[in-house]
């Protein structure tokens, strides 16, 4: 082994060690999760990743009390931004976003359900729930809930289609989920 190969091997080992340390800081980390770097997290404990969840490089989480929850087998491309709060305004007071003022923020969890794909540079805003099997296109700003198996794009994100027909959703759910975990499709 030459010096170049040795250096690559050492750098790889350091990278794997750092990745494991980052995952241990999370509020919850299931099996087979990945969290790229760099990440900008106000609080690692506010991130919950379930089995097989993968976040590519460049996650930014802006949160004081809200959590970011990513469920099983969901993935992101680079540059995901998650904002769990909104700044309030009070009559008769100057607008101030200093750290001391964040106690007045309205914070809500952001939830990404199972089997979701989030494209490059997606922004998820406070209280949003991205439904199971949804696809969020690159650059989308999601400020309202996303229906299961829908495709959303734009700013603000809007439904532009569905990835599966209803009969395909039934087949897909049967293949992947136990009966008690399947979406109710009669609504």
Feature locations, PLM:
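Terminal amphipathic alpha-helical/low-complexity segments used for targeting or macromolecular assembly
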Residues: 1-32, 73, 80, 85-95, ...
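Short linear elements at protein peripheries
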Residues: 18-52
